[in-house]
Amino acid sequence: MLRSMYSGISGMKNFQTKLDVIGNNIANVNTYGFKKGRVTFSDLYSQQISGATGATGTRGGVNPRQVGLGAQLASIDTIYTPGSTQSTARPLDLAITGDGYFQVKDPGGNILFTRAGNFYFDENNGDIVNSDGYHLVGTGGKTPLNIPADAESFSIGADGTISYIPAGGGTVNTSQKIELMNFSNPGGLTKVGGNLFQESDNSGTATVMKNPKIQSGALEMSNVDLSEEFTEMIVAQRGFQANTKIITTSDEILQELVNLKR
């Protein structure tokens, strides 16, 4: 009975974590470039009542007798399927087609990665920044990309090349390029908030994509499917309720045992 109670507690903890992840997914259903999370479980250790025995000449083999001791959290994964693309007709809104991440530099000089392509001009110097003011960087992740404030016009090509006509006309400047980065294991990236990811020991080192595909005038939406999340929420809620029932039932049995002696 104590085993069943502890199994119920482990199940409740797991389904609470699942509900936490589902809640975060739903909260970010309209967040640009957001990638949803997924929770998986695995069983805990099993207590062995008796071991397995092989067959003999006079009797057959016997399978092991084991009692499971509950469930545990196996993983919280980030699902990197692409979100739908929303047209904005704004040239600094950039959507990545396929794999890849923009690289931005925070005030401390750290390189972070994002799929959210809503960029803006720094009015002071024409640098391209994200909503937090982090600089979009190009080749080598060192130099902030810049379009002079007095440029007559500009465009961003599908390969990331930035083209602009300087003030007063003249030759089109194409010296800057947005580089998309990729990882051998994107699932190993660490979320740091603000639609940003950080390289980790298990993500592999960022490498430059050879054939980047960028769509100017569009944004990648969240890949959260509300109908799927609501279904998972119902399943998690019922799972939580079922585990509470295990605890209350075990408690009732213990109460009966206590009442045997009056």
Go through the PLM ranges and name each one.
Residues 1-142, 146-262:
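Amphipathic alpha-helical polymerization modules
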